[in-house]
Amino acid sequence: MRPILLQGHERALTQIRYNRDGDIIFSTAKDQHICAWYAHNGERLGTYHGHQGAIWTVDVDPTTTIIASGAADNTVRLWDVKTGKCLKTWDFNTAVKRVEFNEDATQLLAVTEQRMGFLGTIVVLDINLDVNGPQSDDRALTITCAESKATVAGWSYMSKYIIAGHEDGSVSQYDAKTGELLFNTQVHEPDLQVTDLQWSPDRTYFITASKDKTAKLVNARDLEVMKTYVTDTPLNSASITPKKDFVILGGGQAAMDVTTTSARQGKFEARFYHKIFEEEIGRVRGHFGPLNTVAVDPNGKGYASGGEDGYVRVHQFDKGYFDFTYEVERQARQQ
């Protein structure tokens, strides 16, 4: 797997997203702009300028018409993908750490930071998919996280629940219509934050990554932990691969703790685990610092990782990846 190296950011990457077709990658970093790239050759499609602080998060609607971003300038912005025009800006009291469209992109959730006396919240905004139409200023729903602030959040299948990961290592399930807290489960070790939450293709289960050096596969309906992937380094990101039963984990020794260690000692690799058997099956090296974000092509043909080193590395899976099977998997096919 020879990677395509994308050099468009001057500072550490914060999030990467593929569009639903898997042909465009959107990346955000701490350098105040969003980049769009063609996934197959790494050509830069364009950049989106307007934020005045580090951009923490980005998401794209299913039709690749609009993207949303959240940043340290306390705003959520909506952009026209084709023209790069900023369609709408929503202001908040604190930084926005995560945005995600629901399945039909009629709503957008935003996770705000707990800071300066303001509690962390999850806010739902109504979205108009017509780029020439008006956008509403109103918040459709506000969930206040009084116990422990939310660090990540997303929509479950059919936009039925909002699932949030918290700073104290717990995961919550909220009713997406009313904002009522339905479940709260201590998925990770207490006081080690959930750093990422990404969905299976059908959104019935999700994977979380945490500073406790594990990733967990969790059922969205009752927050039951189905699988646990144990590593030897704090994790920043985790993703589920379609087509094959794998998960990809990214992390590494925290950037502030890295002194003169080699890349190998820092454990700056993307790790592949078997989704069912919970065993590590391979690693991909390359970044000169922790991996902050990993994302998988929705078609299952490749993945991209973004690091503290400011690079995005896009990998296309080769034949060996698709051919790899366990003995029990081969036997099951033959029967």
Curated annotation (Swiss-Prot):
Subcellular location per the Swiss-Prot or TrEMBL entry: Cytoplasm
GO biological process, one term: formation of cytoplasmic translation initiation complex
Segments annotated as WD repeats: 8-47, 50-91, 145-184, 189-228, 286-325
GO cellular component: eukaryotic 43S preinitiation complex; eukaryotic 48S preinitiation complex; eukaryotic translation initiation factor 3 complex, eIF3e; eukaryotic translation initiation factor 3 complex, eIF3m; nuclear periphery
Xref: Pfam families: EIF3I
Predominant place of localization: cytoplasm
Keyword Repeat: yes
SUPFAM superfamilies noted in UniProt: WD40 repeat-like
Keywords of this entry: Cytoplasm, Initiation factor, Protein biosynthesis, Repeat, WD repeat
Entry GO MF terms: RNA binding; translation initiation factor activity
HAMAP family, sorted: eIF3i
Family to which the UniProt record says this protein belongs: Belongs to the eIF-3 subunit I family.
Primary role: Component of the eukaryotic translation initiation factor 3 (eIF-3) complex, which is involved in protein synthesis of a specialized repertoire of mRNAs and, together with other initiation factors, stimulates binding of mRNA and methionyl-tRNAi to the 40S ribosome. The eIF-3 complex specifically targets and initiates translation of a subset of mRNAs involved in cell proliferation.
Complexes and interactors: Component of the eukaryotic translation initiation factor 3 (eIF-3) complex.
Protein name (database record): Eukaryotic translation initiation factor 3 subunit I
